[in-house]
Amino acid sequence: MLKKLLLLNIGLFFIPSIYAAELNSGDTSWILTSTALVLFMTLPGLALFYGGLVRSKNVLSVLMQCFAIACLISVCWVVYGYSLAFKGDGLFIGNLSAAFLNGVSRDSLVGGVPETVFITFQMTFAIITPALVVGAFAERMKFGAMCLFSVVWFTLVYLPACHMVWGGGYLANIGVIDFAGGLVVHATCGIGALVI
């Protein structure tokens, strides 16, 4: 009996970690590193890049626009963005079940990483996407109009695209795979910049 119990316990060590809902420290550290890298692409990277493309009198304006977008979109992401992008099973948009990060605890996991880390990682993509559009209207839009445009564009364009591709919506259901944001980030902001 003791041998059978010992063999059973040894066999349990070979069960793949996929079946266990536990924290993966390697994945978590990589996602945290990636989060910092994507955030540095926006602030200071994109801000300084756009600052170098405009006339010297508008450098501070472009830097402030990128910084303001980072602040505004961070707040919008926590209030309703994460919920609309990744919660619910709608084809085009999620639901508000996790508005204000309701139901997110320090113990909740998404794919082996803490959900708070996943939320922060996805927030960096939500920040950089409207910041990329700044290049289309640099030196041409007032600050208040830019803030309003960024929040409206984030809500009406980015969130549905994010949900449809990464959040299990329509495009994910038909097999679209977007690993690095080619559709969700670059196509949406490119088309948005073209329309402006």
Predicted ranges, named:
Residues L2-I196:
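Hydrophobic alpha-helical transmembrane bundles of multi-pass membrane proteins
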